[in-house]
């Protein structure tokens, strides 16, 4: 069984690389639009906030709880966002994919489905995950639609799961894909990616 991370995962359009402190400036540039952070629990819009965000991610990786990535666009080598494995449970082989964000010019295209494909393929096929979860704010209908389009199943709602930056209480919706569902999800995702790019993911 391969390690879940840290690892580099390469597709046809993007590459996921382990997130490090050297990426701070590129991440700050990619994340400078405030609308990116509307539904996120952290908003690293300054150099100091980004450094703190990266430090927390590094600590979580060192503890084996999370494996954060930067998303690099292959056509120009530009960092266009971030995603990560979190809630890593080695003994049970379960993991969550989350903390995903992209610069606005990467919204609505091939970037997110390819990133999720790379992460899920590695989790299920190399790490032998039995369950991959995805969560989002109950009010984030765009994210929910994107998760459903991946083929994930709705599991339920966690009430008052966290407090938003504005002080309101957040209900979190939970989706998942389990081991037995992955082959079908994979085929549909590969077709979607091939239709979008004209080549294999």
Question: What are these regions, as identified by a protein language model?
Answer:
Residues 1-111, 122, 126, 167-201:
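GNAT-family acyltransferases
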Residues 103-117, 130, 138-144:
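Conserved glycine-rich acetyl-CoA-binding loop
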Residues 125-135:
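Conserved GNAT acetyl-CoA-binding A-motif
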Residues 135, 153-167:
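Conserved catalytic-core motifs of GNAT/GCN5-like acyltransferases
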Residues 139-140, 161-162, 181-182:
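Short Gly/Pro-enriched loop/turn and capping motifs at secondary-structure junctions
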Residues 140-156:
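Conserved active-site alpha-helix within GNAT-family acetyltransferase domains
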């Amino acid at each position: 069984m391969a390690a879940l991370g840290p690892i580099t995962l390469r597709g046809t359009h993007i590459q996921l690389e382990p997130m490090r402190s050297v990426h701070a400036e590129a991440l700050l540039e990619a994340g400078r639009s405030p609308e990116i952070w509307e539904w996120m629990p952290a908003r690293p819009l300054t150099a100091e906030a980004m450094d703190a965000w990266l430090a927390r991610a590094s600590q979580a990786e060192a503890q084996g709880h999370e494996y954060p990535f930067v998303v690099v666009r292959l056509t120009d080598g530009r960092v266009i966002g971030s995603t990560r494995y979190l809630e890593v449970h080695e003994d049970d082989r379960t993991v969550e994919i989350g903390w995903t964000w992209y610069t606005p010019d990467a919204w609505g295209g091939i970037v997110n489905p390819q990133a999720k494909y790379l992460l899920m393929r590695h989790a299920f096929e190399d790490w032998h995950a039995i369950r991959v979860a995805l969560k989002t704010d109950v009010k984030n209908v765009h994210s929910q639609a994107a998760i459903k389009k991946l083929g994930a199943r709705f599991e339920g709602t966690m009430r008052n799961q966290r407090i938003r930056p504005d002080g309101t209480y957040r209900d979190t919706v939970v989706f998942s894909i389990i081991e037995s569902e992955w082959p079908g999800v994979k085929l549909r995702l590969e077709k979607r990616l091939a239709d979008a790019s004209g080549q294999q993911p």
